[in-house]
Regions:
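Transit-peptide-like, low-complexity N-terminal presequences
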Residues: 1-46, 335-339
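Cytosolic, membrane-interface loops and tails of multi-pass inner-membrane proteins
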Residues: 31-41, 101-122, 218-251
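Small-residue-rich segments of transmembrane alpha-helices in multi-pass membrane proteins
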Residues: 62-65, 116, 178-194, 312-325
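Membrane-embedded alpha-helical segments that form the functional core of polytopic membrane enzymes
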Residues: 62-103, 111, 135, 139, ...
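Multi-pass membrane catalytic core of lipid/isoprenoid biosynthesis enzymes
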Residues: 111-152, 243-272
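Intramembrane alpha-helical segments
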Residues: 124, 128-194
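Interfacial loop-to-transmembrane junctions
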Residues: 293-321
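Juxtamembrane boundary at the C-terminal end of a transmembrane helix
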Residues: 324-339
Length: 339
């Protein structure tokens, strides 16, 4: 006995197709259609996580931890935990709000067009509330579990990033300079979480992270200069030169990369001069610095997208290793060493 048409309509979803130019109908169960859609559509949870920019968030957490450790004579793990959680909440919320503000620009760039907002997977109001919620929770968390100064630094970093750096991307080539201030705030937050103030040593850590951002983000700006130009963003000094590399193209960008990298290497020696670390760190910082400058010089000579990518990778390797040696070679840790 054949099932009636009513039964077929109730249990299946008819999807029209064409085979050899002849219209036809294929009956596909609703469960199959829904399953296929679920498989093809990225998870909403994954999309919300991506709004926090996990790769950047990792470096933020590392920098905060370094600030905590360098400020501590005997590290309180509870304080460290509060600092990491609070800073991660603020940074993640700031990143989500940045996604919301730049959703129109992101839709114009190839590398960002697939993000949750430009692709339509998430609604703007969802992202806005998510970003506000994370940010406020982070600031309040830092202020109540640690101290008011740490919360204020987090609030200042959030506001300067969203209200100064983000709009300046479309108006001024100084945006990278302005953005480097909130970008270096995590080490101050880590230090303030432990000490409740900001001594000279905290500003040395700040200077290291501040200068590191120039070769790092200018390399990204050069790699994706065509995308940024399409979106009207002035991320590099040579922003109006376009995507083609010629004899003069990138001269200002790579000159700034070279100078800030040189300054970074010099500033990286200051922890030794201030008695924060031992001579072992000095040797490590020198070796890392020379390696970074070698890559910078190669990129400056080449000025290609591939060279900029190598530089980007070098900066990503340089900073965590420098911080690692900084923490391992603290003077209180190696007080008994001959160095």
């Amino acid at each position: 006995m054949k099932p009636s048409r009513e039964v077929i309509r109730a249990e299946t979803s008819a999807i029209p197709i064409r085979l050899l130019g002849v219209p036809d109908v294929v009956a596909v169960p609703h469960s199959v259609v829904l399953t296929a859609r679920a498989v093809n559509q990225p998870s909403r949870v994954k999309d919300f996580i991506s709004l926090t920019k996990p790769e950047v968030l990792f470096l933020v957490v590392v920098a905060t931890g370094v600030g905590c450790v360098m400020a501590s004579k005997s590290l309180d793990l509870l304080t460290l935990m509060h600092a990491l959680i609070g800073t991660a909440l603020v940074a993640g919320g700031t990143a989500a709000l940045n996604h919301y503000i730049e959703r129109a620009s992101d839709s114009l760039m190839r590398r960002t067009a697939g993000r949750p907002l430009p692709s339509g997977r998430l609604k703007p109001n969802e992202v806005l509330m998510f970003g506000i919620g994370l940010s406020l929770k982070g600031i309040v968390y830092l202020a109540f579990t640690l101290n008011l100064l740490t919360g204020l630094i987090g609030l200042t970093a959030l506001l300067s990033y969203l209200l100064l750096y983000t709009p300046l991307k479309r108006r001024s080539r100084l945006c990278t300079l302005v953005g480097a201030f909130p970008g270096a705030a995590p080490v101050l937050m880590g230090w303030a979480a432990v000490r409740g103030d900001l001594g000279p040593e905290a500003w040395v850590l700040f200077a290291i992270l501040f200068l590191w951002q120039f070769p790092h983000f200018l390399a990204i700006g050069w790699m994706y200069r065509e995308d940024y130009t399409r979106a009207g963003m002035l991320m590099i000094p040579d922003a109006k030169e376009g995507p083609d590399v010629n004899e003069d193209s990138g001269r200002m960008t790579f000159s700034l990369i070279r100078r800030t990298a040189q300054a970074l290497v010099v500033v990286s020696f200051l922890p030794v001069l201030m008695g924060m670390t031992s001579g072992v760190y000095l040797c490590s910082a020198l070796l890392l610095g020379l390696s970074l400058l070698y890559v910078v010089n190669g990129a400056t000579s080449d000025r290609s997208g591939v060279a900029a990518k190598h530089l980007l990778h070098a900066t990503v390797i340089y900073l965590p290793l420098l911080f690692l040696f900084l923490v391992l070679c603290r003077t209180d840790v190696v007080a008994g060493w001959p160095l």
